[in-house]
Amino acid sequence: MLLTNEQIEIINSQEKEIKIIAGAGAAKTTTLVEFTKVRPNKTFLYIAFNKSVKQEGEKRFGSNVLVKTAHGLAYSNFVSKRYKVVNELKEKDFREIFDEYSDLIDFAEFVYTINRCFELYCHLPHNKPLLPYQIKSTNTNFVNNVNKAIGVVVNKMIKGELPMTHDAYLKFYMLTNPQLNYDYILFDEGQDASPVMLRIFASQ
């Protein structure tokens, strides 16, 4: 395979951190494959952005490279067989948790607000309460109640009393401050990564 001077420079680099900026079709993955080939005694974790990229990576990388999506990594290390996972929470899930509010005329709106805010919480790279502008309310009491409700949802999920969403277990995995024991971590299509994904890998 004929490599460009730029690719050769990257492959031979001894820098601790390397960022590759290139357009579509610029052989970024090929560069990463060659990077691993010249380091057969090193261990690599290759993070693919989605399932199709992961499947392609599994075909191209050698045995010293573990290929995972970020969610796949979190699932295997945090979820395993301990938790039930769903694509999204339903109204019945919230109705069981917040039974005292279930007779409210605007319960559907209550569920929508908690669900939306919980999804936002799952995308933030920290464990701080949501701010008023994020909840879209200037009512301090309402903001506090929403944050309390999010805390209830989190605790129920951790205890296994409520199924986890995919973004939830990724967030919970991040909060464990995982240490990934690989010589190199390769993050393909990093520009599309969520703040939670970036927090996991930037903290290594």
Task: Give, region by region, the residue ranges found by the protein language model.
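Non-catalytic, well-ordered alpha-helical scaffold segments
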Residues: K51, K68-H71, Y75, I105, ...
